[in-house]
Amino acid sequence: MNVLRSGIVTMLLLAAFSVQAACTWPAWEQFKKDYISQEGRVIDPSDARKITTSEGQSYGMFSALAANDRAAFDNILDWTQNNLAQGSLKERLPAWLWGKKENSKWEVLDSNSASDGDVWMAWSLLEAGRLWKEQRYTDIGSALLKRIAREEVVTVPGLGSMLLPGKVGFAEDNSWRFNPSYLPPTLAQYFTRFGAPWTTLRETNQRLLLETAPKGFSPDWVRYEKDKGWQLKAEKTLISSYDAIRVYMWVGMMPDSDPQKARMLNRFKPMATFTEKNGYPPEKVDVATGKAQGKGPVGFSAAMLPFLQNRDAQAVQRQRVADNFPGSDAYYNYVLTLFGQGWDQHRFRFSTKGELLPDWGQECANSH
């Protein structure tokens, strides 16, 4: 009898282990060990101040949701509210930068906002509310999205509603500065369900992406002037690099059913062509001339996985990621890998409406 009981226990343990294994996302588990404190702070160790950004917190929340890791999601959310939003994301946008000051105090280093982190945070909260059936997340996400619309969206003559990179420092009387990587088209589509200004922003965001890449390479930053339009031949060379790499990744993650995806892929085809020809994405490209220099780091290769349509070219970048997987001191490369490789491994997809389609599996639906 004891032998039978022992055998049954062993079988149950093996079954439980197999379910856990099916639910585990190894890259996410390693990211938590290397980059997230027990309290829920996503740390960038490459900076001497051991900084945390609202971007990092938002990417952590997205990854936790995609991994069905509710405990991590709650920790990251709680730390963000308590340390970046003075206790409530309903009442204020999160400060974008937190870390160690010269006097050794740990606190907010820059209270300005960063809309790339803000929109991912709002979207992750809204989707967490839907998928985990938790009204609290929905309420916080809705309030945050309304605050983004009030504090970070402006009306630009000749364009319409546009998302500023932050609430302070990007708008002058007749000039506005934008970052094309800050609002992924999939999120822009998702937010249209909330009405103005998001219905307009989806269209103007498409213009930002399509009209600022004359040679097929998106700029990290670009300026728009009243009556003059996009300033693509600025005094200072416009570069496509560490910010813009996300543009190609976001475009690649658009569902094939989105009628704008083919147009976007075609606009940025030179980036795909360069990567296919050379075996790696460029680190920097002159937006005006299309001249590339340097070899992009491993995170760039991960970001290209959703974007590349050629399977052989995908395989080359997939192998480059596997051979050079980010370590414990490469925050940005790692988050790009969570997105790009995670998508490539079918750990998540996005619907035509911009909703998350996680690959939790039926047996994983309640695992946190």
Swiss-Prot record:
Principal localisation: secreted
Reaction(s) catalysed (UniProt annotation): Endohydrolysis of (1->4)-beta-D-glucosidic linkages in cellulose, lichenin and cereal beta-D-glucans
PROSITE patterns: GLYCOSYL_HYDROL_F8 (PS00812)
EC class: hydrolase
Gene Ontology terms: cellular component: extracellular region
Pathway this chain belongs to: Glycan metabolism; bacterial cellulose biosynthesis
Family matches, as InterPro entries: 6-hairpin_glycosidase_sf, 6hp_glycosidase-like_sf, Glyco_hydro_8, Glyco_hydro_8_CS
Active site: E55 (proton donor), D116 (nucleophile)
Keywords attached to this entry: Carbohydrate metabolism, Cellulose degradation, Glycosidase, Hydrolase, Polysaccharide degradation, Secreted, Signal
GO biological process: cellulose catabolic process
EC number(s) reported in the record: 3.2.1.4
GO MF entry, a single one: cellulase activity
Source organism superkingdom: Bacteria
Location of the protein in the cell: Secreted
Region forming the signal peptide: 1-21
Function: Hydrolyzes carboxymethylcellulose.
Something else known: The genes bscA, bcsB, bcsZ and bcsC are constitutively transcribed but cellulose synthesis occurs only when DgcC, a putative transmembrane protein regulated by CsgD, is expressed. Cellulose production is abolished in E.coli K12.
NCBIfam families, per the entry: PRK11097.1
Similarity-based family: Belongs to the glycosyl hydrolase 8 (cellulase D) family.
Name of the protein described by the UniProt record: Endoglucanase
Source organism per UniProt: Escherichia coli (strain K12)
